[in-house]
């Protein structure tokens, strides 16, 4: 139990690092939540701080999810604080990753007012199911290219993930996943564990929930399209 609590606590604290708020303070001396969409995420960093800062914020937020889901669990597996949790390891990876997502949305370092969690959730799933996530990223980029609405890309990508896992696992009969090797050595495991379907559905529901205001603006025609380096 102590090891499990340590994993989710460390993962939550990693997710809580308020990347865009730190960037806003460092680059312009502002609280980014008072500008643009008012959100402390990568998309608003693109709008308010410019594309370079927005890209850096997004990549760091992605890394938070990946680190929390995979290296943190691996570290405590090698150095447990007592017994290691007796549960499916992919499920544990997902729980750790979701702890980071919760930390990003409800950051303890910024009054529990963070971002929407899309980049951190993506990072979690990149670490666990990288090939499926490459396909999801393709959906995300295509949706933004066609609509210039990041919210549309985020929602469609979130819905696409469990669908892609289900198609690869059951339609193409790929089992629990594949190991990809480089020069005869293990490189990365691309999981298709059934827990991904469950958590993928949870993540999709959470992303849709955190974008409920965006959905209302989309229907009313007032949603912000993606721009770079402008305050709106």
Curated annotation (Swiss-Prot):
Transmembrane stretches, start-end: 4-24, 56-76, 90-110, 124-144, 147-167, 191-211
EC number: 2.3.1.275
Molecular-function GO term, any one: acyl-phosphate glycerol-3-phosphate acyltransferase activity
Membrane topology reported for the UniProt record: Multi-pass membrane protein
Subcellular location: Cell inner membrane
Stated family: Belongs to the PlsY family.
The protein's assembly and partners: Probably interacts with PlsX.
Task of the protein: Catalyzes the transfer of an acyl group from acyl-phosphate (acyl-PO(4)) to glycerol-3-phosphate (G3P) to form lysophosphatidic acid (LPA). This enzyme utilizes acyl-phosphate as fatty acyl donor, but not acyl-CoA or acyl-ACP.
Record-given protein name: Glycerol-3-phosphate acyltransferase
Natural source organism: Chlorobaculum parvum (strain DSM 263 / NCIMB 8327)
Taxonomic classification: Bacteria, Pseudomonadati, Chlorobiota, Chlorobiia, Chlorobiales
Gene behind the chain: plsY
């Amino acid at each position: 139990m102590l090891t499990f609590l340590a994993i989710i606590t460390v993962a939550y604290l990693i997710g809580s690092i308020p990347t865009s708020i730190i960037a806003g303070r460092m680059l312009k001396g502002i609280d980014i939540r008072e500008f643009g969409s008012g959100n402390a995420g990568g998309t608003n960093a693109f709008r308010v701080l410019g594309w370079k800062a927005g890209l850096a914020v997004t990549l760091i937020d992605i890394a938070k999810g990946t680190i929390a889901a995979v290296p943190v669990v691996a570290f405590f597996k090698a150095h447990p604080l007592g017994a290691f949790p007796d549960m499916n390891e992919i499920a544990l990876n997902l729980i750790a990753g979701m702890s980071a997502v919760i930390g990003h949305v409800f950051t303890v370092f910024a009054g529990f007012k963070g971002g929407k969690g899309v980049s951190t959730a993506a990072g979690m799933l990149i670490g666990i199911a990288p090939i499926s996530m490459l396909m999801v990223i393709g959906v995300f980029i295509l949706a933004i290219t066609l609509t210039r609405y990041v919210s549309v890309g985020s929602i469609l990508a979130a819905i696409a993930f469990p669908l892609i896992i289900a198609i690869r696992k059951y339609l193409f009969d790929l089992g629990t996943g594949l190991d990809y090797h480089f020069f005869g050595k293990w490189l990365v495991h691309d999981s298709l564990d059934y827990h991904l379907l469950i958590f993928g559905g949870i993540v999709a529901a959470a992303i849709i929930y955190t974008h409920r205001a965006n959905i209302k603006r989309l229907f009313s025609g007032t949603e912000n399209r993606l721009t770079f380096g402008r305050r709106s």
